């Protein structure tokens, strides 16, 4: 009996497409998805009892591995006396305090429930603070399913081949300007044309939602320069790369200070969580201090705060975790490149710390959305199915990132490289 198929088929009766997030349907790779039952460390198990070495990690959050003992214990302990109050708690102060005291350029922070909430709220705050309406986002970058972001978006929008999104009125995107990632001249032209109306730029400082694409430090400096010149805010969307490429996130890669930063994924320890923070003078424009209104019934709830606090403290107190992830990440990257070269396989590997993407292409580098769109989707599909059959859970999309955790070992990397070497292309 195929329990995976049985559960997925029944799910389709009650949930659109059988899923609660489109990429989980495995539609782009043409098979039914495994239905996951349990996970521990770097391993997960499906309903048929198949085990996989997991390189998806819930799309990034599980940097400590699945069911980390300290995170689980924190959740259990908190749940014995509190779940949700819709009121202030000491736990939300504890998490806010460690974040503000250990992260760069975060004087104050506001907790929300998801990455989408964090980014849409940060953009609203930027508009309220500057009294301007237009926002620049970059083609291929995904900032959640907020209407104003669903234009030239990455992630599932790109995976599912959706040119836009039905249900998004033209009015909702008229103030969204599209920049080209790593193209200084094009962004400069946007400011020359619309500069007095631009409230800010939102950018993934390490793009992960069109696959991993690195930001040129020179390009980032230009964004800061333009924002300063036109009195706009620079917003780093670190929902994915925050706490992943380094404890302090992608800010460690650039000599550039953002005005606002958004977080989610890792900071919630695997539970629904998000946050946005920045300079005090900006954050104090939020209600109840200022006129920018944002609220949430479940924001800062004790269970999530306890999981987030356990995760953040563990990462902060153990910098060697990032050394380990860099070591095995470098080994994986170099091994894949060496095998591809030996096979004569057109491949670009983009990696930053514990996030990585394989682009099947004859290009020498992949540095923007247009480069990503030229990649060989059919070859990726064959690669994905090959690796799944070898016992590896990797993203079912060429436009997503693979992730590493502190629980991945050199043995896991060796097994991945062995499986990749047997891929015939």
Curated annotation (Swiss-Prot):
NCBIfam families: hemL, PRK00062.1. It is an enzyme of class 5 (isomerase). Pfam families: Aminotran_3. GO terms for molecular function: glutamate-1-semialdehyde 2,1-aminomutase activity; pyridoxal phosphate binding; transaminase activity. One of its GO terms (biological process) is protoporphyrinogen IX biosynthetic process. Pathway: Porphyrin-containing compound metabolism; protoporphyrin-IX biosynthesis; 5-aminolevulinate from L-glutamyl-tRNA(Glu): step 2/2. Its EC number is 5.4.3.8. The keyword Electron transport does not apply. This is Glutamate-1-semialdehyde 2,1-aminomutase. The modification N6-(pyridoxal phosphate)lysine is found at residue 265. It catalyses: (S)-4-amino-5-oxopentanoate = 5-aminolevulinate. Its cofactor is pyridoxal 5'-phosphate. Keywords: Cytoplasm, Isomerase, Porphyrin biosynthesis, Pyridoxal phosphate. Belongs to the class-III pyridoxal-phosphate-dependent aminotransferase family. HemL subfamily. Homodimer. It is found in: Cytoplasm. SUPFAM superfamilies: PLP-dependent transferases. GO terms for cellular component: cytoplasm.
């Amino acid at each position: 009996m195929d329990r995976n198929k049985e559960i997925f088929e029944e799910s389709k009766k009650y949930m659109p497409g059988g899923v609660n997030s489109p990429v989980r349907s495995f539609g782009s790779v043409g098979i039914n998805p495994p239905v996951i039952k349990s996970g521990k460390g770097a391993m997960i198990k499906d309903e048929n009892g198949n085990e996989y070495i997991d390189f998806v990690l819930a799309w990034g959050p599980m940097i400590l591995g699945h069911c980390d003992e300290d995170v689980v214990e924190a959740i259990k302990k908190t749940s014995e006396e509190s779940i949700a109050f819709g009121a202030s708690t000491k736990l939300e102060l504890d998490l806010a305090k460690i974040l503000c005291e250990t992260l760069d350029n975060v004087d104050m922070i506001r907790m929300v429930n998801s990455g989408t909430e964090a980014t849409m709220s940060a953009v609203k705050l930027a508009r309220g603070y500057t009294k301007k309406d237009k926002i620049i986002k970059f083609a291929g970058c995904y900032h959640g399913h907020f209407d104003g972001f669903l234009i030239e978006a990455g992630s599932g929008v790109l995976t599912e081949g959706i040119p836009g999104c039905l249900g998004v009125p033209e009015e909702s995107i008229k103030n969204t300007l599209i920049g080209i990632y790593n193209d200084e001249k094009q962004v400069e032209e946007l400011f020359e044309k619309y500069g007095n109306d631009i409230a800010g730029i939102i950018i993934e400082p390490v793009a992960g939602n069109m696959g991993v694409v690195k930001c040129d430090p020179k390009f980032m400096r230009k964004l800061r320069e333009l924002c300063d010149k036109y009195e706009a805010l620079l917003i780093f969307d670190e929902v994915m790369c925050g706490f992943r490429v380094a404890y302090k996130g992608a800010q460690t890669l650039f000599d550039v200070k953002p005005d606002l930063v958004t977080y989610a994924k890792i900071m919630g320890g695997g539970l629904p969580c998000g946050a946005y923070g920045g300079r005090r003078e900006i954050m104090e424009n939020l209600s109840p201090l200022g006129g920018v209104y944002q609220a949430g019934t479940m924001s800062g709830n004790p269970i999530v705060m306890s999981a987030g606090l356990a995760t953040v403290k563990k990462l902060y107190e153990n910098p060697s975790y990032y050394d380990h992830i860099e070591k095995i990440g470098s080994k994986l990257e170099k091994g894949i490149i060496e095998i591809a070269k030996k096979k004569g396989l057109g491949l670009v590997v983009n990696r930053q710390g514990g996030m990585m993407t394989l682009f099947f292409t004859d290009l020498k580098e992949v540095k923007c959305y247009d480069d990503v769109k030229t990649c060989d989707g059919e070859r990726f599909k064959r690669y994905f199915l090959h690796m799944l059959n070898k016992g590896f859970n990797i993203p079912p999309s060429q436009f997503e990132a693979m992730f590493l955790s502190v629980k991945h070992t050199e043995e896991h990397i060796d097994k991945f490289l062995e499986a990749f070497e047997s891929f015939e292309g």
